[in-house]
């Protein structure tokens, strides 16, 4: 069985490696309503690493770190799902190892993170006990990367303040068929998160699942999300399979606030991508030019 498993991974690698391992930068230039004049903010976002060999190796993560730093963003956000959930792997990379590589990310206003559903789902202790912290969250905090769970922090650039907020994951707990019944599904609290914003400076919201955008008020300037992988298959602007629906499958969407959904970097279910290569997102806020995908 071990030999057959290795053969299966090898065959999959042969067929799917090119689109899975390609890496691009998706750039968006956005001017939200009421964005402060004179504040131009460059945000690099990475999402859905799903760290594992051979698809998202430590060398691959190091490449992503180097490419992200080379963009010279003002701030870096990480949008969850660092942990792999699919089974076509030769090794699940321990959290301490991938977090150690992510510690190389650097930006003047820091590196900030939220967790995704797989960071919760693959932590069996958390699922059994019904509470965190997760292994993934502890690993990030250990290397100096703050993990936001319904929290907000006031930052400033060029004398202009803004808020960076992070939502707890809305799908943190798996269905009871795998673990003991829980009375809650998520750890998200949008109201409590926004209540921590204490002035009228603009708000940027990190939320792993984009679905929350339907409830996010116009008080928020920008929501940044991952989770969907752009469907992993995307043709002519359409994703046949998207856990958050077609409207929120990928890209820049105008709702109550501007929403950018990353296509992510890793894979879920199967190591396969078509029409939506792995990407780092770079959002420039306060730039008058139109968005470029």
What are these regions (language model features)?
Residues 40-53, 161-171, 204-207, 258-264:
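Active-site-proximal beta-strand elements of phosphoester/diester hydrolases
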